[in-house]
């Protein structure tokens, strides 16, 4: 079974403030149980409870997906499934959350799982370290009852399969379009896929969706900023036919955009 459900980690403890005179440096009282107090102050207990009960699927843990997953967990979502087969490469370090010199060669899903458990020790986390394509897509989508899905896949065919599978199951989904070859963060937009424009990946995806009768029905995070000339090169890598130049902050911004759609959707604030 490729779906290796992670065991739930122990709860954080409390450290009492150290006694002593006022002039002494005193230890701050730490209470890890209330780490979501600022979120509750913003959203209220009822909506925070909705997030705690929600299960979000994130597929693709590169420059966009890992940021999306972390922001969603930091907002208080209590269950998550993350999926990616890639290991960290040196070329990932300029933009990917899990990529450090010390993590090169390690599985992205495993590294991210450690971060997510450290943020919320009580999270129910499922880690899938396989490429999601063909029949794997249906297996993944049917493995649990999800409340929202994030598509952060950068290859067209598995991206299309995940989107179609989610739509067939009436699973709310947000999809990231191309974050490469762009530098202006103010150009990012969130819209129904039918409203996307001046994004080559979105254009190709729409054409493929039209062939299967899909023209709308999910939000996309994209940027109409023209791609910088010379930022695309062809390559011969597994599951990849090209490499695109990227800057550190645009993929992160796209991931945050995806997270915002998920969080607002789960609490009923997404128009």
Predicted regions mapped to residue ranges:
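N-terminal charged helix/coil linker that caps or initiates catalytic domains
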Residues: 24, 28-56
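Conserved N-terminal Rossmann-fold NAD(P)-binding element of oxidoreductases
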Residues: 59-60, 83
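Hydrophobic/small residue at the entry helix of a nucleotide-binding pocket
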Residues: 64
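Conserved SAM/SAH-binding loop
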Residues: 129-136
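Short amphipathic alpha-helix with an adjacent loop that forms part of the alpha/beta core around
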Residues: 136-145
């Amino acid at each position: 079974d490729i779906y290796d459900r992670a065991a739930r980690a122990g709860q954080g403890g409390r450290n009492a403030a150290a006694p002593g005179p006022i002039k002494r440096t005193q230890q701050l009282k730490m209470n890890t149980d209330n780490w979501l107090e600022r979120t509750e102050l913003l959203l209220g207990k009822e909506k925070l409870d909705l997030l705690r009960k929600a299960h979000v699927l994130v597929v693709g843990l590169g420059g966009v997906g890992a940021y999306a997953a972390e922001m969603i967990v930091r907002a208080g979502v209590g269950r998550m499934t993350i999926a990616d087969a890639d290991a960290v490469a040196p070329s990932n370090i300029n933009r990917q959350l899990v990529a450090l010199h010390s993590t090169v060669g390690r599985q992205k899903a495993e590294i991210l799982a450690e971060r997510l458990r450290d943020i919320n020790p009580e999270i129910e986390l499922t880690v899938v370290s396989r490429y999601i394509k063909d029949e794997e897509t249906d297996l993944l989508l049917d493995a649990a009852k999800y409340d929202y899905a994030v598509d952060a896949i950068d290859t067209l065919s598995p991206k299309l399969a995940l989107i179609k599978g989610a739509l067939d199951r009436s699973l709310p989904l947000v999809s990231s379009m191309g974050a490469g070859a762009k530098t202006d963060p103010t150009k990012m937009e969130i819209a129904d896929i039918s409203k996307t424009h001046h994004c080559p990946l979105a254009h190709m995806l729409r054409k493929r969706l039209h062939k299967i009768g899909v023209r709308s029905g999910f939000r996309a995070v994209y940027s109409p900023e023209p791609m910088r000339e010379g930022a695309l090169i062809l390559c011969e890598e597994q599951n990849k036919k090209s490499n695109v130049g990227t800057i550190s902050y645009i993929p992160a911004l796209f991931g945050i955009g995806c997270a915002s759609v998920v969080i607002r959707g789960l609490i009923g604030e997404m128009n």
